[in-house]
Amino acid sequence: IVRNSGGLGVVLDQGVLNISLIFKGQTETTIDEAFTVMYLLICKMFEDEDVDIHTHEIEQSYCPGKFDLSIDGKKFAGISQRRVRGGIAVQIYLCVEGSGSKRAAMMRDFYQHALKGETTKFRFPNIDSESMASLETLLNKDIKVQDVMFLLLYALKDLGAQLNMDPVTEDEWQRYEGYFEKMIERNAKMHQKLDL
């Protein structure tokens, strides 16, 4: 799957949770404000844990950025954004289960294989696999993606959000199917190029 925000690749598997916040309006919310809202939401979700969550770039992680989230200097999440029709979408991937350092090693190997030692105009990160970890590792407890989804719901409720369980409309379903088909086609093209 190719995500539609951010600049570099991230690992998306069953142990990673993605959350998106959509801010309506072209100019009412700045990118930094939207990032800060996501950061504060994550802090709220984990307020019962005895940890400090920091936001600053972890340079030797994959997809480094100034809104990397870390505990004890190890990145477990990254926030990205993109402009969407009528607003801003802020997206976060949370490395919940498994090994964050193994995911980082996989991305390091991916870049090394893709670059084949060539110099490029764009600078790719020099990934240190030990710069990343999962929440499971950092919190030193068994935590699953589903647990974090419940933490998200509880945090939103505590913050006064109203959660609506509206069914998907026919128009939304058709758009989803169209986007899904485009993603399948795009991924097939990438696989074809990789098989050469």
Regions of interest found by a model, annotated:
Residues 1-25:
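A glycine-rich, hydrophobic loop/mini-helix early in the fold
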Residues 9-14, 84-85, 125-126:
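Short glycine/proline-enriched loop/turn "hinge" motifs that connect secondary-structure elements
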Residues 16-59:
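Contiguous, small/hydrophobic- and glycine-enriched helical/loop subdomains that border
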Residues 23-27, 74, 98-101:
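Short loop segments at secondary-structure junctions
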Residues 49-51, 86-196:
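Long, positively charged amphipathic alpha-helical accessory segments at protein N-termini or as interdomain linkers
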Residues 55-75, 173, 177:
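Beta-rich nucleic-acid/ligand-interaction surfaces
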Residues 73-81, 89-91:
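Aromatic/basic-lined ligand-recognition segments
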